[in-house]
Regions:
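N-terminal periplasmic accessory domains that precede
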Residues: 76-82, 126-129, 148-151, 163, ...
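C-terminal beta-signal and adjacent terminal beta-strands/loops
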Residues: 642-651, 674-736
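Short, acidic, small-residue-rich periplasmic hinge/interaction motif at the N-terminus
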Residues: 18-22, 29-34, 62-66, 74-119, ...
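Flexible loop and strand-edge segments within Gram-negative outer membrane beta-barrel domains
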Residues: 260-281, 287-351, 356-377
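Gram-negative outer-membrane beta-barrel transporters
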Residues: 432-435, 538-547, 565-649
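Extracytoplasmic beta-strand/coil segments of soluble accessory domains associated
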Residues: 51, 127-171
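Short acidic/polar hinge/loop motifs at secondary-structure boundaries
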Residues: 48-51, 167-194, 282
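Membrane-embedded beta-barrel scaffold of Gram-negative outer-membrane proteins
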Residues: 249, 350-364, 464, 470-472, ...
Length: 736
């Protein structure tokens, strides 16, 4: 530790320290007289003043990530000192707060979850990757199929725009299932944006945007392997390999295999807690670039998902077998050209294109009761042009074409086919005034062959009130087409009959139902500071989503799922406070509280949405030891979540009246993990989820039907069925 002492002399030395490449100031760098303990710190703008000493005329200037500079002071001229950055690929720096962080200076409420954060839990796939995140909730769609879904801002995940590498590809028939088809070990980072978000990816964002960035050429290792085994009978093997063919061409190959063979009924309701089956998934990705500003990104992915759910055989009840088989493949191509200005009056520009095609096949069978099959084919074409208008502003505009073809068959209701074609333009203007005021304004204007002209405006603003203190305000419109079966796949795991009340004056609408449309507005106050000389911060946000049109799913009807257009108001209001700080070196605490009120005008009155916790507390503790034996360390992570009671569907008048409470009990979920890591080589991890073994005992309601089949309803899942789950895993990396 260097003791820094100010020396007052009659002719102090003054100067500024800059990054040699970017010419940006280097804040708080160390300036000392060479060979002494006499020195000072530069201020936030890189300026420094240091008193002279009679025994030395050479200054040593140091900053993390840069080479030291030695400057001989010969006169009283103010100094400009340029530091050269080190080769960061050769540095091994442990970033104490780099695993999950808010972007305070972004006009959106934008959060990044890195690969290191995902390693704090098992995170077998994207649907399980939010266990250590306070903004996104994970839950189950029903008590039989084991399908996981997410919620944002008190709304189902179908109202969030889900993307892979900035391409919306978890939508339509795979809005729910698609989350489980992104293996966690393939993920480099996840970007989460609350609110309507940017207009450039599309109009389907209402509650937020989630973008998954896959691993690629930037990987440090040549080969990565992840193996996982859990006591629930689940086993996984994942690989990622990186290859080079010359300086400008890189490609990587990803594989995933998962097997579930545990036939457990830990809550003793007569049904398997998780389905049994297999998943095969593979992805080939290639990246091409040259010295003229061109970058190409291409990928092809295919998967097969086969599972079976139903009765466990532990109780004397009629046998139920539900088969769920899914196939999906997609091809994506992105090209970009960056044009550097050749003259002083030229503007920096870039052009980008996206071409994406995907096909999904879905087959669901509950023999004698329900059969569903669906096929979705999607083609997306995008052209974007970005130009730097001046030092403060940038304009991005472009053209978009979307072609969606759906063929669905649901027994006993028949065939549902639709063909959606959307084309139009979009533009987004970004203005940044001295990094103190920032505005992003955008809009889309498109023509939809079924719903007509669509105008989608959005606005995000940020004001810096003081150093580290930012106020944000945002608003925007979002819309989507409802998929009444695959938006609520838990409906298939019940004897409920679907009743659709169509709009008689709009025969061109799919099933006679309108496009869902909502305004989202939010305000955010964030503060980044230092506590105990370490990074700390707090973010407080409030959002309200007001639906102008909505397809209401009414579960409060005996034996029915009623589907009808909103006739009144539907408003979701949320408020959240999240703070993090580090009381000790390598020890971080993250805490959050969230409040939700979600009210809907159903056809028989206003009430809250089911399966929404009004209050939720969240705490995550992370600690890592010092390195020992050169490059090893222990990592400890603990996450605690308290969920308030949730309103359950109404059973009045049904054969199961009184068998479920009106509101579920509140409960804690405690997860923990211990890892032994050898830096950049391997990790061995051991974890437990639901430490206190809380489980929902009555998740499925059933009775014998008059025709020998079973009447059942599994749409009451508010908590885990399996209880405590432990797992062990290995992450192994092969360096260059």
């Amino acid at each position: 530790m260097i003791g820094l002492t100010g020396w007052a002399q009659s002719t102090p030395v003054k100067g500024v320290v800059l990054d040699k490449d970017s010419k940006e100031p280097l804040a708080y760098c160390v300036v000392v007289w060479k060979g002494t303990r006499a020195g000072t710190l530069a201020d936030e703008n890189g300026f420094f003043t240091i008193g002279r000493i009679p025994t030395q005329d050479t200054l040593k200037v140091s900053f993390i990530g840069f080479e030291d500079a030695f400057v001989v002071v010969k006169n009283n001229v103010d100094l400009t000192i340029l530091l050269k950055g080190l080769d960061m690929e050769r540095l091994n720096i442990y970033d104490q707060h780099g695993t999950q962080h808010m972007h305070g200076k972004d006009p959106q409420l934008f959060q990044t979850v890195t690969e290191k954060e995902l390693c704090k839990a098992a995170c077998c796939n994207l649907s399980e990757s939010f266990e250590t995140n306070a903004s996104v909730d994970g839950s189950y769609t029903d008590g039989i199929t084991g399908t996981r879904q997410i919620k944002m801002l008190g709304l189902d995940g179908k109202y969030a725009q889900l993307m892979g590498d900035n391409i919306p590809n978890m939508r339509g028939l795979n809005t729910v299932y698609g989350l489980g088809w992104v293996p966690g070990p393939w993920i480099r980072e996840i970007a989460i944006s609350k609110g309507a978000g940017s207009v450039l990816p599309g109009y389907e964002s209402i509650a937020g945007q989630i973008n998954v960035a896959h691993k690629g050429p930037e990987m440090k290792e040549k080969f990565f392997l992840n193996a996982y085994a859990g006591n629930q009978g689940r086993y996984e093997l994942n690989t990622v390999s990186r290859h080079e063919a010359g300086e400008h061409f890189h490609w990587d190959w990803m594989t995933h295999y998962a097997k579930n063979n545990g036939r457990f009924d830990m809550n003793h309701d007569g049904f398997l807690d998780n389905p049994v089956g297999d998943e095969y998934n593979g992805r080939l990705h290639a990246a091409l670039n040259n010295d003229n500003g061109f970058n190409g990104d291409y990928s092809i992915q295919g998967l097969q998902y086969l599972n079976q759910a139903g009765t466990s055989g532990h109780l004397d009840i009629p046998n139920v077998v539900m088969n769920n088989n899914q196939w999906k493949w997609n091809v994506d191509a992105k090209n970009g050209w960056v044009f550097e200005p050749d003259a002083a009056d030229e503007k920096e520009q870039s052009i980008g294109t996206q071409v994406s095609f995907s096909q999904q096949l879905s087959k669901w069978n509950w023999e004698g009761v329900k059969n569903y099959s669906g096929r979705q084919q999607t083609l997306r074409l995008v052209f974007l042009h970005a130009i730097q208008l001046n030092e403060d502003s940038k304009l991005t505009y472009g053209w978009n074409y979307l072609d969606d073809q759906y063929k669905e068959y649901f027994s006993p209701m028949g065939s549902w086919d639709r063909h959606e074609r959307v084309q139009g333009g979009m533009a987004e203007w970004a203005w940044n005034h001295h990094d103190e005021i920032q505005i992003i304004a955008g809009a889309r204007a498109e023509w939809h062959n079924l719903f007509g002209f669509l105008l989608t405006p959005r606005l995000h603003t940020r004001f810096t009130l003081a150093e580290g203190l930012h106020l944000k305000w945002m608003t925007g419109l979002g819309r989507r087409t409802a998929n009444v079966i695959m938006d609520q796949p838990g409906f298939l795991a019940s004897s409920r009959v679907m009743s659709i009340q169509a709009l008689t004056n709009q025969p061109q609408y799919p099933l006679g139902l309108p496009m869902e449309e909502a305004w989202n507005k939010g305000v955010v106050l964030s503060y980044d500071t230092k506590l105990f000389y370490r990074k700390a911060g707090i973010t407080v946000d409030a959002f309200q989503t007001n639906f102008k049109q909505q397809v209401v799913m009414d579960w409060d009807q005996s034996g029915l799922l009623k589907v009808y257009p909103l006739q009144g108001k539907s408003v979701s209001t949320t408020a959240q406070a999240e703070a993090f700080f580090s009381p000790l070196k390598r020890f971080e605490i993250r805490m959050a509280y969230r409040w939700v009120e979600n009210m809907v005008d159903y056809e028989d009155g206003r009430r809250s949405l089911p399966f929404v916790s009004k209050n939720r507390f969240f705490t995550n503790l992370s600690y890592s030891t010092k390195m020992f034996e050169g490059d090893k360390r222990w990592l400890f992570d603990l996450t605690a979540k308290w969920n308030d009671g949730q309103r359950l569907p109404n059973l009045l008048g049904s054969q199961w009246e009184g068998q479920q409470p009106e509101v579920s009990p509140a409960f804690w979920i405690i997860n923990g993990q211990v890892s032994l890591a050898r830096e950049e080589r391997w990790d061995v991890y051991l974890g437990v989820e639901n430490l206190f073994n809380f489980k929902q005992n009555r998740m499925v309601l059933y009775s014998d039907g008059s025709d020998g089949t079973m009447n059942l309803d599994a749409n009451f899942a508010y908590a885990p069925a399996f209880g405590r789950m432990s797992y062990v895993g290995l992450r192994w990396r092969l360096a260059e």
